[in-house]
UniProtKB/Swiss-Prot annotation:
It comes from Methanothermobacter thermautotrophicus (strain ATCC 29096 / DSM 1053 / JCM 10044 / NBRC 100330 / Delta H) (Methanobacterium thermoautotrophicum). Belongs to the CdhD family. Part of a complex that catalyzes the reversible cleavage of acetyl-CoA, allowing autotrophic growth from CO(2). Probably maintains the overall quaternary structure of the ACDS complex. InterPro entries: Ac-CoA_synth_d_su_TIM-brl, ACDS_complex_subunit, CO_DH/Ac-CoA_synth_dsu, Dihydropteroate_synth-like_sf. This is Acetyl-CoA decarbonylase/synthase complex subunit delta.
């Protein structure tokens, strides 16, 4: 009977290539494995290859250094009673190709009206000075070391407080008296009123070499350009992530009489997680075009890094995301650092920690930093203090 079953099983296996056995168990006292000669040869060859790899000589890596026919214009901000800062002047894209002549600059955002809608991690630093733009700017400079201040004239918006251009000029005068750093003067974003406001603000700050923000194709950019020419200011040329739009606007401003040394471009900053790759693409292409000789794009660039706070990950309270006290500044820092590595020269920011860290990082981009003597970090541990447990 058993032989019949075995014979039947063998017939079933005649045309079978493989057998899969489920829930198989084998109890043995001793197991011997025999390797086929081909398997032994494969093992020996593998060992030989590994020995050959380990024996390869080390090769020194030298980063590729390119030379470019063009360079970025240098823009000076701050004259008269102001300290001066310089933007641009680059002759290469990467720091290892050639360090920047001027470090990137961070400017503190200040507003002409209280901003209770700011995220708490920012508001808690400035809640005591929000009623007065002069005090707000003074605190940014004296307590947090701001090298520049951006005064946003939000209150002039028709749907906000509808402050007149003359009232805006008084706010500018107050901030000018409060601090001695260069100013960026921004409007409310209203295309009809902003040129009038910037014109009056430029007059109030005559000779102080401020940056008027901004001129774009949706408003009277000619009026903004004339205000800059008449009162010795520079102009922020704002385009929305479009290289061709940026070229067109720059060309129009140059036709109005501005020089490349009077223009700073803002290609628009999309926040981390909200389209930052578009900004990386446009900013890098813009800088490369400038270095390759496109004179319409040979100006420094600005980043509205404050846009990072519009990301819900920066301010929304959610326990699994971690505390906003850290998350918000980190979101702003990473957004700014990404723009810095892409070629941006000046950053508008909100949080004191973000401003400080990005400024410190920017200083490493300069020739002075790269040629300075650095300490031997291998000796960073000088003493150990421990207790046995």
């Amino acid at each position: 009977m058993l032989m019949d079953k075995l014979t039947e099983l063998l017939k079933l296996l005649q045309n079978t290539e493989s057998i899969e056995i489920n829930e198989f168990r084998m109890d043995v006292e001793e197991l011997e494995l025999y390797l086929m000669p081909a398997v032994q040869q494969a093992i020996q060859k593998t060992v030989e290859v590994r020995e050959a790899v380990e024996a390869l000589p080390a090769e020194e890596f030298n980063p590729p250094i390119r030379s470019y026919p063009g360079e970025v214009a240098q823009v000076k901000l701050g004259e008269g009673t102001r300290k001066s800062v310089y933007l641009g002047g680059q002759k290469a894209l990467y720091r290892f190709e050639e360090p920047q002549p001027n470090p990137p600059v961070v400017t503190f955002d200040v507003f002409d009206i209280p901003m209770p809608g700011l995220p708490r991690p920012i508001r808690e630093h400035f809640s005591d000075v929000m009623e007065d733009p002069g005090d707000w700017a003074r605190k940014a400079v004296k307590e947090y070391g701001a090298n520049m201040v951006t005064i946003h004239l939000i209150g002039t918006g028709p749907k906000v407080m509808d402050k007149s251009p003359r009232e805006a000029a008084k706010d500018i005068e107050e901030v000018l008296q409060a601090v001695d750093v260069p100013l960026v003067i921004g409007g409310s974003g209203d295309p009809e009123k902003d040129p009038l406001v910037l014109e009056k603000a430029a007059e109030a700050a005559e000779g102080e070499r401020c940056l008027l923000a901004s001129a774009n194709l949706d408003l009277d950019y000619r009026k903004v350009a004339r205000a800059a020419l008449d009162h010795n200011h520079a102009v922020l040329s704002w385009a929305i992530t479009d290289v061709n739009m940026q070229k067109t606007l720059n060309r129009y401003l140059l036709k109005e009489g501005l020089k490349r040394e009077d223009i700073v471009m803002d290609p628009t900053t999309c926040a981390l997680g909200y389209g930052i790759e578009f900004s990386i693409d446009v900013i890098t292409r813009t800088r490369l075009a400038a270095l390759k000789g496109d004179s319409d794009l040979q100006m420094p660039m600005s980043s509205g890094t404050t846009n990072a706070w519009g990301s819900r990950e920066a301010w929304m309270k959610k326990d699994e995301w971690g505390p906003t006290d850290y998350r918000g500044p980190l979101w702003e820092i990473v957004t700014g650092l990404t723009m810095m590595l892409s070629g941006v020269d000046i950053f508008m920011m909100l949080h004191p920690t973000s401003v400080r860290l990005l400024r410190e990082i920017g200083e490493t981009f300069t020739r002075e930093y790269m040629t300075a003597e650095t300490p031997d970090l291998r000796e960073w541990i000088t003493e150990l203090d421990y207790q046995e447990v």
